[in-house]
A protein has these predicted regions:
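N-terminal transmembrane-helix/juxtamembrane module of multi-pass inner/ER membrane proteins
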Residues: 1-71, 103-129
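Membrane-embedded catalytic cores of phosphoryl/pyrophosphoryl-handling enzymes
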Residues: 3-10, 123-177
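Interfacial segments of alpha-helical transmembrane regions
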Residues: 19-20, 74-101
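Membrane-helix interface segments
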Residues: 54-55, 81-85, 156-162
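Aromatic-anchored segments of alpha-helical transmembrane domains
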Residues: 31-35, 93-101, 166-177
Length: 177
């Protein structure tokens, strides 16, 4: 029996996961287009100035999926599926290193500071602590996307893949809500 090379495994994984990766690529390209066409402040203000009670209630919990939750799940997987757990945890660690490096490189101010300096109102949610620096890239969003992507690559169920895609989008949106 011939062992597949890493490149062959990657190509196979990309083919098998096209139902997750294609929508992700489309959303990423749409987001890139919006960022290229519109000012960052206008985008944030458009999103932020349309609060709703459900969003105010749910997004503080959804955003937590981009914190320690992925590492806890990775640790639990470690108890039962060593290879899968190591994959999930390694994706998280690599992502965290990349985000930490980029945050320190860009040192972007967070919307709270920018809006305050411009005299603009910023809708906030009670109980959610707002920081001042290192806004870009979003660690929560990266953690969630990396986590849900790694899970989508592991599972075979297409409905679960779609669920993971939707959850990663919700966490990302919760960061600008």
């Amino acid at each position: 029996m011939k062992t597949k090379t890493y490149l062959q495994q990657l190509v196979t994984s990309l083919k098998v996961n096209k139902f997750y990766l294609l929508p992700y690529l489309i959303v990423w390209l749409m987001g890139l287009l919006v960022v290229l066409l519109y000012d960052k402040i206008d985008i944030h203000q458009f999103t932020n100035q349309r609060p709703c009670g459900i969003g105010d209630s749910l997004f503080p919990y959804i955003t937590k999926l981009g914190e320690t939750f992925p590492f806890i799940v990775g640790g639990i997987l470690l108890l039962f599926h060593l290879r899968k757990a190591l994959f999930v945890l390694s994706v998280q660690v690599v992502g965290a290193i990349v985000v930490y490096t980029l945050k320190n490189l860009f040192r972007a101010r967070r919307p709270r500071i920018v809006f305050q300096e411009l005299g603009l109102d910023l809708h906030t949610i009670d109980g959610v602590r707002l920081h001042a620096w290192n806004s870009f890239p979003s660690g929560h969003t990266m953690t969630a996307f990396a986590f849900f992507l790694s899970l989508a690559l592991i599972v075979k169920n297409k409905l679960l893949k779609f669920f993971f895609f939707a959850m990663s989008l919700l966490v990302g949106f919760s960061r600008i809500y």
